[in-house]
């Protein structure tokens, strides 16, 4: 809204056993309402879709993160994690740009704390956090800045029509009919 003022917005989420507050900074508007900074994807862009876990492992220290459910790490197994991360993408930006790529699109990189099959990113458990196994929020911001310095674009893929079984909206839905449920597996 035009009357919005810069400052911290507090988003309050009701959960079993209490409330969770998330502080979200609202910054001053960019000149031209962002049109001088952000450029949308057009038909002239060459988009490269990358499944980050399968691309390049630039930081082996985040391959297995203590406390996360999926500790698999085996490049020989199709459904295990392979260790690719955002640092691996950053390390290969010259190569990617050399291919003529103008925009990067990743399969979802938000936290996907499921017990297995987390390599694809489509069972998000936290829409507010970049998965630590990819390098986390700060590294995602660094990648975004580096792409923009190169005149490249970043497409953020977020899935909102389904969530992982450990997402707070699955564990503590705001209403009983919030998520469709069937007595048996349905395909």
Positions of the model-derived regions?
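Extended acidic/polar, glycine-enriched regions
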Residues: 1-40
């Amino acid at each position: 809204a035009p009357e919005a003022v810069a400052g911290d917005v507090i988003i309050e989420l009701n959960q079993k056993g209490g409330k969770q507050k998330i502080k979200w900074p609202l910054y001053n508007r960019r000149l031209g309402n962002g049109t001088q900074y952000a450029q949308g994807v057009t038909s002239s862009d060459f988009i490269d879709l990358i499944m980050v876990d399968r691309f390049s492992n630039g930081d082996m220290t985040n391959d297995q993160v203590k406390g996360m459910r999926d500790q698999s790490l085996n490049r020989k197994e199709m459904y295990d994690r392979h260790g690719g991360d955002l640092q691996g993408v950053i390390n290969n930006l010259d190569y990617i740009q050399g291919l003529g790529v103008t925009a990067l699109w990743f399969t979802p990189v938000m936290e996907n704390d499921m017990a297995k099959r987390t390599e694809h990113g489509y069972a998000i458990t936290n829409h507010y956090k970049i998965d630590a196994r990819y390098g986390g929020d700060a590294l995602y911001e660094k990648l975004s800045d580096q792409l923009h310095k190169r005149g490249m674009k970043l497409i953020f893929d977020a899935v909102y029509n389904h969530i992982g079984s450990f997402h707070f909206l699955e564990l503590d839905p705001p209403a009983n009919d919030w998520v469709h449920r069937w007595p048996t597996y349905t395909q």
